[in-house]
């Protein structure tokens, strides 16, 4: 008895076209309002039902590549974007007009375009990038031509030979290898520290941005920094005059003298160091029970053995 088999393509087993296969993530009209069948049978019924309004194309963008802009063709675009000139300039032949969706590589200037399909966005981005590269190349050629003309390496045309020419070419040769530097007779002359200037001197102030400490400046407000520092130094000088202290007598500073006196000693014998001094003080780690200034007083005048005993 002969055994009969069903045909390989049976309408019972195969879903008739058109239909979508499971996993399709695109839009299907009226799919969210239908149920009771498999995905293939349900989409086949929705796509063939004349009562359901739908598009005439199963895929809205039937052409995988966007239409070329007006005045261009794919042959011209292929020569521009995929031709020899582009590969020599960019060095990457992967960027063509037929960019497939899902490409994870970098496409120059693609972040500037949106609200279009992937192929259209890639087309616009590559066209914009190619135009920018051509502009930069033309600027580079123009700079090379200018350099050749200035150095005399560009051969002259017949028309240029008939023009009036100058006796000298740029750049002009230097007259001396070591020219004498220019010194202005009215140049700025440093006048020394503002602390040692007279009160009537208009330069007795610190410019804005000075981060050093200015005595008495924290108590003056309501004026600009130069005016504040001027008043602070004048007030500080008056306070020292009442105590019998003058900067000019102590430091031996003369107006017009730019040399500052060097202080070779760090540890003063008469005074202690200010708090938060981070340098080394001999014998300080063996002392305790007094202020920092008292413990660091006369650091060089006492030996380590003497400083172990607190006065």
Curated annotation (Swiss-Prot):
Record-level GO cellular component terms: axonemal microtubule
Keywords of the record: Cell projection, Cytoplasm, Cytoskeleton
Keyword Lyase: no
Subcellular location: Cytoplasm, Cytoskeleton, Cilium axoneme
Protein name: Ciliary microtubule inner protein 2B
Functional description taken from the UniProt entry: Microtubule inner protein (MIP) part of the dynein-decorated doublet microtubules (DMTs) in cilia axoneme, which is required for motile cilia beating.
UniProt-listed InterPro entries: CMI2A-C-like_dom
Start and end residues of each stretch annotated as Disordered: 64-93, 150-183
UniProt source species: Xenopus laevis (African clawed frog)
Pfam families named among the record's database cross-references: CMI2B-like
Main location as per UniProt: cytoplasm
Expressed in which tissues: Expressed in airway epithelial cells.
Assigned protein family: Belongs to the CIMIP2 family.
